[in-house]
UniProtKB/Swiss-Prot annotation:
Keywords: Cell inner membrane, Cell membrane, Cobalamin biosynthesis, Magnesium, Membrane, Transferase, Transmembrane, Transmembrane helix. GO terms for molecular function: adenosylcobinamide-GDP ribazoletransferase activity; cobalamin 5'-phosphate synthase activity. Its main location: membrane. It is found in: Cell inner membrane. It catalyses: alpha-ribazole + adenosylcob(III)inamide-GDP = adenosylcob(III)alamin + GMP + H(+); alpha-ribazole 5'-phosphate + adenosylcob(III)inamide-GDP = adenosylcob(III)alamin 5'-phosphate + GMP + H(+). This is Adenosylcobinamide-GDP ribazoletransferase. HAMAP family: CobS. Its cofactor is Mg(2+). The keyword Transport does not apply. The gene is cobS. It is a multi-pass membrane protein. Pfam families: CobS.
Length: 259
């Protein structure tokens, strides 16, 4: 087992990759360590979820839950620099506008926002806000828990693609290129353990619904991306995170209303 300092180094790499939080200067970064850092992508999601939930809880003292949710969403975007939202938009533009695999991948690399990407972004943000606002009607405090679970579990789902799917982008300058190295069972185990620990925050039946629902989404997206482009790219990982986050809020709303 690697030392705690090595593990901390990997976590800080993951944090630096997925957020705008600066890494300490002593952190050692290379392609191999970035690939190993994928084990902590879920934990970085927990950090983002906790900070977003903190913003929500503070704002709740002065504004309504629906407005506090907007501030929490803004906080998460500022923390990540819209990293995953950008991936969602690029994926929507590529898969919506390209007729061949090559064209789809080329469109994804284009930094300009197209109509498909704009629609995907607007719909995704509206869905997040509406689902969390509906959750707040049952219990305003449940939104904080939803934010933590949503940000954690969605990143676990996205990062798990590295273990089983084929990386297809040939762009050497891509920020996610080092992730193309296949994830080891050790990385996947720690990733899944993070998800399991976060699920202890809710009841067994609620956790079971989330597991089955997110597993179904993961299988469906893997099938769709393989059919469309033959594997995954950094952009489709971002799209997966955003879709899984929305589904997580939807499932929490369903089970919250049922149990």
């Amino acid at each position: 087992m690697q030392s705690w300092r090595q593990q901390l180094n990997l976590f800080l790499i993951a944090m630096g990759f997925f957020t705008r939080i600066p890494m300490p200067k002593w952190v050692e970064v290379d392609a191999e360590k970035l690939n190993q850092a994928s084990r902590y992508f879920g934990l970085v999601g927990t950090l983002i979820g906790v900070l977003s939930a903190l913003v929500y809880s503070v704002m709740l003292h002065w504004v309504s839950p629906s407005i506090a949710i907007i501030f929490a969403m803004i906080a998460s975007v500022l923390l990540t620099g819209g990293f995953h939202e950008d991936g969602l938009a690029d994926t929507a533009d590529g898969l919506g506008g390209g007729w061949t695999v090559e064209a789809k991948l080329q469109i994804m690399k284009d930094s300009r926002l197209g109509s498909y990407g704009a629609l995907a972004l607007v719909l995704c943000l509206l869905l997040k806000w509406q689902l969390l606002s509906e959750l707040a009607l049952f219990d305003p405090s449940s939104v904080s828990l939803a934010l933590i679970l949503g940000h954690t579990l969605s990143r676990v789902v996205a990062a798990s693609f590295i273990f089983s799917e084929q990386y297809v982008s040939d762009d050497a300058s891509s920020k996610s290129k080092p992730l193309a190295m296949q994830q080891s069972i050790n990385e996947l185990s720690i990733l899944l353990a993070t998800a399991a620990i976060s699920l202890l925050l809710i009841s067994f039946m609620q956790a079971l619904v989330l597991i089955l629902g997110l597993l179904s989404v993961r299988i469906a997206l893997a099938w769709w991306f393989n059919k469309q482009i033959g594997g995954y790219t950094g952009d489709t990982l971002g799209a997966t995170q955003q879709i899984a986050e929305v589904v997580c809020y939807l499932l929490l709303l369903i089970v919250g209303a049922s149990w």
